A protein has these predicted regions:
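Charge-dense polyanion-binding interfaces
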Residues: 293-297
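Conserved PLP-enzyme active-site core in the AAT-like
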Residues: 1-155
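Conserved C-terminal alpha-helix-loop-beta "cap" of PLP-dependent enzymes
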Residues: 147, 151, 155-265, 271-279, ...
């Protein structure tokens, strides 16, 4: 919120603020405070809640819909029992309904998929009609068990909030170990056919949903135990020298000819025309050493 206020004061021409909450890793922003600051400067708040479609049904206090955002976008297919490509826009401010409708007329197809729309309605009705106490209990027990693993660390809400976050979505399962993220991802696939959502330089991300039962959590925990046994305590894994580091060093101080990013998730590290700094080169070197896929170089 402090960053938003500083930007709004420095740039009075700003019309809207776009915030991603929760993040890929499940970090929740204080949308209520951000909205208060932005609205005081007559700035709209648009929240990318793509990974939080389940929040209104499980943790409504974490959903931007209930925190003062003007527009909230959710990808139902990410965390609800809905088909890929299904998403919704929540227009929470009455005076924006008409402008959003006009924009949709321009950008949306005039022949929408009724199969998708029926599936979306079914998914929302499923969430509204069910109680998820059993799921939450299973998830809590699973997370408590994971905390006992000596070699694999799972991100906990307390640590995330202590680092300054407003909240944490505990359905997001984020693990790190003494090996790079891609190596842990491959290990989970090899030991138990577990398909991770993504791997970062030092972590992997898995998504739990309300359709996961106790048996699913038990199977995942068994796989984590096998991976934990395979990891040695001696594995400090000194930083490897980045393959092609000399070529990367030559990029320092030059202009990027194309966007440079790691995929997934696809967020730009450097955009076209921006200066590639020495710090950026160091970061790219670390990503490459970890085995991540860098695009644009």
């Amino acid at each position: 919120a402090d960053d938003v206020e500083r930007l709004c004061e420095s740039h009075p021409e700003i019309a809207a603020v776009v915030v991603t909450s929760p993040t890929y890793e499940g970090v929740i922003s204080d949308i209520a405070q951000i909205a208060r600051v932005a609205h005081a400067h007559h700035v709209r708040v648009i929240v990318d809640e793509a990974h939080g479609a389940h929040l209104p049904f499980i943790k409504p206090e974490y959903s931007a819909i209930h925190m003062g955002a003007d527009v909230v976008v959710q990808s139902l297919h990410k965390t609800l029992p809905a088909m890929t490509q299904t998403a919704v826009i929540h227009v929470c401010t009455e005076e924006l309904v008409k402008p959003v409708e006009q924009a949709l007329e321009i950008f949306l197809s005039s022949s929408p998929s009724y199969i998708f729309m029926m599936n979306m309605e079914a998914a929302i009705c499923y969430m509204a009609d069910h109680d998820f106490t059993e799921y939450e209990n299973n998830l809590r027990e699973f997370r408590e068990n994971c905390a006992k693993l000596p070699q694999i660390t799972m991100i906990e809400k307390e640590a995330v909030c202590a680092a300054g976050a407003y909240g944490y979505d505990e359905t997001r399962l984020v693990y790190s170990a003494a090996v790079p993220g891609p190596e842990l991802l491959a290990m989970l696939a090899d030991k138990g056919d577990v398909v991770c959502e993504m791997a970062g330089r030092k972590h992997v991300v898995l998504i739990s949903t309300v359709r996961d039962g106790q048996e699913d959590f038990e199977q995942l925990y068994r796989t984590l135990q096998m991976c934990d046994v395979a990891l040695t305590k001696e594995g400090d894994h000194e930083k490897e020298r980045c393959a092609g580091q000399e070529e990367l060093q030559k990029l320092a101080g030059t202009l990027a000819r194309a966007p440079i990013y790691v995929y997934p998730p696809g967020s730009y590290i450097v955009n076209t025309g921006e200066i590639i700094t020495a710090e950026t080169v160091e970061k790219l070197c670390a990503y490459q050493a970890a085995g991540l896929h860098i695009r644009g170089i």
